[in-house]
Amino acid sequence: MSSSETKGRNEEDVAEIKKAIATGAVKDPSNLSAIPPIFVVSGANFSMNFLLLCIQSSVCCACVFAVKKLGIISFRDFDMKDAKMWFPISFLLVSVIYTGSKSLQYLSIPVYTIFKNLTIILIAYGEVLWFGGRVTALTFVSFIFMVISSIIAAWSDVQSALASSIPGASSGVSVGAMQSLFGALRGLNVGYFWMLVNCLTSAAYVLSMRKRIKSTGFSDWDTMFYNNLLSIPVLAVFSLIAEDWGRENLNRNFPAETRNFLLFAIAFSGAAAVGISYTTAWCVRVTSSTTYSMVGALNKLPVAASGMLFFGDPVTVGSVSAVGVGFFAGIVYAVAKNNQKKNERRQAADAIIPMASRKP
């Protein structure tokens, strides 16, 4: 391969990494450790993502065990009864990762992000059914603005995808063009199927985790520990089944010249995931599944804005509008939740004041 081809591939890799960061292509909340995993998976030949996540979870558990031995933190000792209750949550987490990777094989990252943000609405109404939550009109408006933000950000990519798949009128409708179009539509149908499964498993994971935290009385460290520990065997099985463990593929994923640094980066990202896993459990426990998902959608916006300000990403009307509408959606959601809390406190106060003492 010539040096110019190598340079071109590297530039494409960098562009894809920045795109993934800005749109939140990585969807595992317990393993988002920023730069180290991005470095590992950014190589054109890296394909063993389940192995990567398995090693990260193992390192995460080892770090927590070490800190517990030092007496800095405390959490429950491993209990088989608790493990059986929590295992479905860990399995759902791995299912979210797998279905997300399958849908990304057929759909572009912006389209994927639109549907992931639609999951927020699914989670909100799941909380209504499971936890007696309430979706106010203003909260629903914030969901709509978040989806609009994603559509604006993805519009140029959607247009280019449609233009490339639909033959132009001037070129005529040939058999090859029609076959190409039907192939693209077939791929989209498969992609939308995996996307639907991903949205359902994502909602089930977040809602089930909150429900299980309440039923088991887990602390944040308990949640973090069991989530990572029970993910290890599931990730290992997925890796053995879905990934190529041949010598040639292992050498391609872990080349000898960078192997030690790659393993160090994976280990470092696993250690960094401790804080992210803990704060994830804390957020779901003290707020709600909907708020956690909304924050997950909002955290892409500062990254996208910094990409335009500091890293040379193209500043267009669409990109600026998408970030602006997204921030507006966050403000509307915050106002809606604040108003909802005030109403709940007012209703609670009215419930405990005797009728004779109430002012007209």
Curated annotation (Swiss-Prot):
It is found in: Golgi apparatus membrane; Cytoplasmic vesicle membrane; Endoplasmic reticulum membrane. The keyword Nucleus does not apply. Keywords: Cytoplasmic vesicle, Endoplasmic reticulum, Golgi apparatus, Membrane, Sugar transport, Transmembrane, Transmembrane helix, Transport. GO terms for biological process: transmembrane transport. Residues 1-49, 106-110, 156-164, 208-220, 282-291, 336-360 are cytoplasmic. Residues 68-84, 132-134, 186, 242-260, 313-314 are lumenal. It is a multi-pass membrane protein. The chain crosses the membrane at residues 50-67, 85-105, 111-131, 135-155, 165-185, 187-207, 221-241, 261-281, 292-312, 315-335. One of its GO terms (cellular component) is endoplasmic reticulum membrane. Belongs to the TPT transporter family. SLC35D subfamily. Homooligomer. This is GDP-mannose transporter. The gene is VRG4.
